[in-house]
Each structure stands twice: as C-alpha cells, then as structure tokens.
Amino acid sequence: MTAPAPTSPARPTPARVLVLGDLVLDVVLMASVPIESGTDIPGRVEIRQGGSAANVARWLARLGVRSQLVCAVGRDGAGRSLVAQLRKDGVNVRAVRIAGHRTGRIGVLVAPSGERSFVADRRAATLMKADDLKPEWFDGLQLIHLPAYSLLVEPLGSAGVRAVELSRSRGARGVRVSIDLASVGPLLAHGRREARELISRLQPDVVLATESEVEALLGRHAPEGILEIAKVAVIKRGPLGARVFARDDRAAGEPPLQFDIATTAVAAEDTTGAGDAFDAGFIAGWLGALASGHGGTDALHRGTLAGHRAASRHLRSPRAELPPG
C-alpha cells in the first residue's frame, strides 16, 4: 500500500486591505547644492506617483496583500495615467472622477541634506463624498487604513468616517482600523483637540506616527498617550527604529506593553515614501502573523520587523517616474 504523500501546511489566504486617501502627482525637486533664493541651482526634477494612501496601497500589493485604493482624481490625463500605473502595480483602484477639478499635485523640495518640504495642492483628492462610496467595496475586508489628513478636510473627511463604518458593517469579523497621523501641518491646522476627538471616535486599532506628529496631536511628547485613543501605537523613529506601545489585559494602573525594534540605517538622499512603505510592511506582517496563529505581542514584533524591511527596500530602490504622457 502506498503511503499518502505528505501535505504542506495550508498558506493563509492573502489579507484584504482597503486604503482611502490621496492619489496625486508628486513633482520632486532634488537640489544638488544648498538652496539659495533668487537664483538658479542645479538638480533633478522628477514626476512620480504620489499620495500617502496610494503609496501604502502599492506597497501592500507588492507584499502579496489584496490591496484596494479608494481615491478621487480629476477627469484629466494626469488622473488617467496615475490610475493606470497603479493598476499595473497590482492595486484594485476605485477612483471617483471629479468633474471641473484637476488631479492633485504635491511639490516636494528635497535639500542636499535630505530635508524635505512640501507644497500641497490636493484639488480633486479632497472632494470625494460619502455618497461616492459603494458598500460592496468593503465586503470581506480584514483592515482599512487611512492617513489622518483623509479625515481632516471636507467632504473627504465624511467619506473617511463612512468608509470606517462600512468596513465594520460589511468587512470580515474583527476587521481592524489603522490610521497614520501622516503630517504635522494638517493636524495643527485642523486643531489638535478636534483632530484627536475625531480620530478617537473612529476607535482605531493601530495609530502609526512619528514623534513630532504625536506631539502635534497630543500637545506633549508622550508617545504612550496615543493609547488613550488606540489599542496600539507604532512610533516611527527613522534610523533609530520603531517603538511600539500596546494595551493588553494588564490590570488598571499597570504600564502598557512597550518594546523597541531596531533597524539598519540606510543612506538615502530622498526619504519620501519610506514611512508609507513601513506602514504597508507593518500591516502585511501583522495581519499575516495573526492569520498564522501568532499571539498579539509576537504579531506586533513581526509586523514591525516587516515594516523596517519594506522601508529599507524602498530607500534602496530607484524611484520610478511616471511614463511620459
């Protein structure tokens, strides 16, 4: 009698993740010498696909996640090109076309030191309405991810809140919500109290942020304070790695779980998008670990390590420009 062939363990089904937010043109100006006002300086100008939400969605697809982006673009060539390129990258793009408004653009000025400054002209990206969302887009989701500035301007903010509601009503059991604080400027412009109350009402499972973004939201340098509005806080510290705080089943008054995950510093003249790659790596690694039966703390470790790997890959890779036309 022939012995049955050994069977390998079944692989977990790829996670379904929806990201809601910007898909824009990035116009990146990289100065070769210190920037001076009132004169020309040498450098490079590149046109890239941009938007934090789009960057996260693209990296999720690269990492094997069933990635979906819900965004708004203009009825123009830029919008068509951006959507087509992202679909080629494996993302299921649900693009709302906004008549009479052009696709958003972000100017990124990169100094020789690597310091970045941004000029945001988001245009159509902010004009998605709650009524534009189709409930079936949210069927079976394991997680919905939003950059905070998808919540801080109307009518996009109402669409973001509605998207979270639809995810919880139509997504998989135990669907999770992650929010990246994304940028200091929009948090301060919206008002830290209002921004904090809005994010808190959404009851996110995870908030990802830099230390400066935490301070902008809370008004103090206390990253663990994010646990007042989320179950997990992942603090991105660049070359210093990441610090994770989590609430668990500890008794009231006990300190939260806290651990650091180091990374290897990567020399890069332009770090644009590295934080988005980290978010995607964390989400993919965390959900994958949970699906494989790893406990909560172990899954957070694995997710954070995966975030570092994705960010390092991003920093070491050449940045693709949009094809001409």
Model-derived segments and their meaning:
Residues 1-72, 77-84, 88, 106, ...:
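Glycine-rich phosphate/adenosyl-contacting loop at the front of the ribokinase-like
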Residues 1-18, 219-325:
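Conserved phosphate-binding/catalytic region of the ribokinase-like
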Residues 22, 71-75, 110-112, 121, ...:
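Cofactor-binding loop segments of dinucleotide-utilizing enzymes, especially the Rossmann-like FAD-
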Residues 23, 149, 277:
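Active-site metal-binding loops of divalent metal-dependent hydrolases
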Residues 85-101:
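A glycine-rich helix N-cap at a beta->alpha junction
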Residues 98, 108-155:
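Conserved phosphate-binding/catalytic loop of the ribokinase/pfkB sugar-kinase fold
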Residues 105-109, 117, 241-245:
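Short beta-strand scaffold segments in enzyme catalytic cores
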Residues 143-224, 240-242, 247-248:
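Conserved beta-alpha-beta core of the PfkB/ribokinase-like small-molecule kinase fold
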